[in-house]
């Protein structure tokens, strides 16, 4: 069994999915996962499909060295963005797994929200590249581990707005400041 870095806030109303040693770039997957954090699962799937079709971009915030600018990043109040297709496909597969895990638990698909999304570095895959004049240089891959936790949203009850005036309780310091400002005693 895989150990998650965090437990969900409500064990009975949550579903988990984990991908280990995924042969996909860590940095691209990190940025893509950060973009979908906090979304509903159905919205995240729609967003990732839009990225694959290049209708929307993934904003690059942390690993942005050498990343070109794109106009689609303005939607995220950013300037740099890309369309990491392979990362999106891997995350879509994990979201599909997450949905089936939620279905087994009897959770409602339309209310699932991604509470926790984490991407960690996996051990580097080492290969060789043979160059001119007998040189050999490393040819590395940077895979990753991804963990997702989705929690079913609760139905929010609207707050009751009363017409009565609320009584504000002040501590001694606040009372003293009010007395100094107004020059009167409040008690």
UniProtKB/Swiss-Prot annotation:
Phylogenetic lineage: Eukaryota, Sar, Alveolata, Apicomplexa, Aconoidasida
A Pfam family reported for this protein in Swiss-Prot or TrEMBL: Ribosomal_L22
Signal peptide coordinates: none
Coiled-coil stretches: none
Protein name (record): Large ribosomal subunit protein uL22
GO cellular component terms attached to this protein's record: cytosolic large ribosomal subunit
UniProt similarity note: Belongs to the universal ribosomal protein uL22 family.
Keyword vocabulary terms for this entry: Ribonucleoprotein, Ribosomal protein
Organism: Theileria parva (East coast fever infection agent)
GO biological process: cytoplasmic translation
Annotated GO MF terms: structural constituent of ribosome
